[in-house]
């Protein structure tokens, strides 16, 4: 993973395990699906081809077909339900593998039975921190990074079609610290993604 857009659960330098059979069977190196047996669910961490430049991205599914999703100053609303935001305590923040954590705020975001830890920049007002209610059409998904103020996601690249979704990420296989000469981060080896 080259960027910090999915911090805190996925860090730059993580090598993640992706189940490419989570939703369907595809012809290798194509978007041709042979058989489909599942659909991405709200809260799944998935990999997909960016429609703008074909790079592989990893983000969290926030909106599924039929959902009405809105973001107001980094506050999420899905189908009219406002997400709750519980600030993480100092002990919880200390356990996160985030350097310079003091420049961010960390919250446990919960909506419609799904929960995750997100981070927002203390100083950012962000032009992408708000978007009006948007109904997700059939065959499309809305993706957001957990690092809300530092993620190139559906707010910038648009909704993602189902056929572009490659699989569901579920673990970190191994991790290296890109800022420390690729030293291994042993504590992250073989850890599950929340």
Task: Set out the residue ranges of the language-model regions.
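Soluble "head" domains of membrane/secretory-pathway proteins
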Residues: 7-194
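Aromatic-capped interface at the extracytoplasmic side
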Residues: 1-6
């Amino acid at each position: 993973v080259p960027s910090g857009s999915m911090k805190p659960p996925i860090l730059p330098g993580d090598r993640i395990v992706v189940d490419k059979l989570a939703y369907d069977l595809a012809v290798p190196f194509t978007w041709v699906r042979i058989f489909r047996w599942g659909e991405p669910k709200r809260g799944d961490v998935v990999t997909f081809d960016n429609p703008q430049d074909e790079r592989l991205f990893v983000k969290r599914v926030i909106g599924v077909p039929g959902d009405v999703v809105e973001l107001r100053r980094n506050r999420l609303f899905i189908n009219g339900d406002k997400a709750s935001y519980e600030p993480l305590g100092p002990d919880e923040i200390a356990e996160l593998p985030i350097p310079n954590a003091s420049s961010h705020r960390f919250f446990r975001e919960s909506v419609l039975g799904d929960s995750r830890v997100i981070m927002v920049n203390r100083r950012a007002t962000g032009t992408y921190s708000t978007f009006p209610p948007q109904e997700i059409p059939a065959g499309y998904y809305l993706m957001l990074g957990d690092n809300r103020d530092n993620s190139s996601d559906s707010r910038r690249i648009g909704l993602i079609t189902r056929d572009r979704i490659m699989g569901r990420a579920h673990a970190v296989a191994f991790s290296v610290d890109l800022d420390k000469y690729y030293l291994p981060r042993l504590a992250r080896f073989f850890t599950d993604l929340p």
